[in-house]
């Protein structure tokens, strides 16, 4: 995250951004293959504030390998000091392509713990920060069988998050791996809505060289009957 990139967003009317630490424990970031540092997250957040962004979300993951309740508490205290406008707390869900799954032997000595105490702690701190829950969703293979919860300050809720979960809103997505979705306004006889998607390639280099193809995919999706 750089000043130049943030200014491009500001100059094009983007008002809500996410700066996602996942955790504020550097050892965990190194373990799970995240290539940013805790200090980079803090510096990026402060830079965005300085440039006028007043609706910033931060994502956390609870249940990361080797992290204790104390580690989660430490992360929440750093978040409290930064005071983001939105906080999204994810329970760890190991996907098929995730590094934790692909290299599972490397992580077998690290316990993955996500308890009601972990979730309650994040909820308590969020409330103390003046953030209130406004959306919730679940995924497969979630640690502790819990859920993901989005918190927001009054007037700062991400409407997009609600719309995408309800699957009632067409969405144009840009970037490698992004999925565009068209929801037909006219309902089916059973009351459901027709939904079709157009996905961008995941590889960044491929996305750049095939950008015209990606644009054409979206164009076809939104012009078809």
Predicted regions and their residues:
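Short, glycine-/Ser/Thr-/acidic-enriched flexible segments
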Residues: 63, 141, 177-180
């Amino acid at each position: 995250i750089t000043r130049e990139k943030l200014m491009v967003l500001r100059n094009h009317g983007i008002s809500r951004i996410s700066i996602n630490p996942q955790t504020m424990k550097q050892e965990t970031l190194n373990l799970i293959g995240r290539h940013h540092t805790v200090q980079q997250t803090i510096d990026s957040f402060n830079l965005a504030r300085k440039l006028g962004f007043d609706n910033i979300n931060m994502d956390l993951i609870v249940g990361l390998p080797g992290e204790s309740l104390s580690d989660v508490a430490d992360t929440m205290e750093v978040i409290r000091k930064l005071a983001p406008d939105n906080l999204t707390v994810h329970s760890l869900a190991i996907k098929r392509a995730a590094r934790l799954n692909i290299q599972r032997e490397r992580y077998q000595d690290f316990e993955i713990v996500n308890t009601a105490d972990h979730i309650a702690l994040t909820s308590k701190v969020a409330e103390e920060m003046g953030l209130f829950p406004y959306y919730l969703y679940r995924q497969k293979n979630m640690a502790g069988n819990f859920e993901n919860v989005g918190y927001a300050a009054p007037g700062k809720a991400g409407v997009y998050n609600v719309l995408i979960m309800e699957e009632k809103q067409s969405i144009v997505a840009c970037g490698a791996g992004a999925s565009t979705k068209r929801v037909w306004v006219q309902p089916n006889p059973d009351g459901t809505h027709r939904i079709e998607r157009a996905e961008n390639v995941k590889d960044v280099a491929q996305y750049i060289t095939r950008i015209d193809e990606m644009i054409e995919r979206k164009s076809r999706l939104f012009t078809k009957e």
